[in-house]
Amino acid sequence: MNIFRLLLATLLVSLCFLTAYSHLAEEKPKDDRSLRSNSSVNLLDFPSVSIVALNKKSKKISRKEAEKKRSSKKKASMKNVARPRPPPPNPCVATRNSCKSPAPACCDPCASCQCRFFRSACTCRVLSPSC
């Protein structure tokens, strides 16, 4: 029985080596002529690339356009910040204070009452910082 297992083990190992060897790539030595012919064919397959230098005017125009885009973004962000907020209600709860259901609303218009642990712990929290 031990001889039979030894024979099966050697057969299995030899099959593993045979499959690994069959999957290896074979490299054949190539002469210079075949390399030259392959390289010329490869160069002809690809389209040629032309490099064009930019003049100073085109660089200035692109910089001006970039500055205009930056300034328009700044103006848009300033418009969002400058909008008026509604006044807080008179009896209100400050941010990060308890705001259970009988308590009044949060003072910050961007804050809302968030409850955890089955509505046992409720606090006023600001959800979005961009508000």
Curated annotation (Swiss-Prot):
Glycans are attached at residue 38. GO terms for molecular function: melanocortin receptor binding; neuropeptide hormone activity. It comes from the Eukaryota. Coiled coil: none annotated. Residues 57-104 are annotated as: Disordered. This is Agouti-signaling protein. Keywords: Disulfide bond, Glycoprotein, Knottin, Secreted, Signal. It comes from Vulpes vulpes.
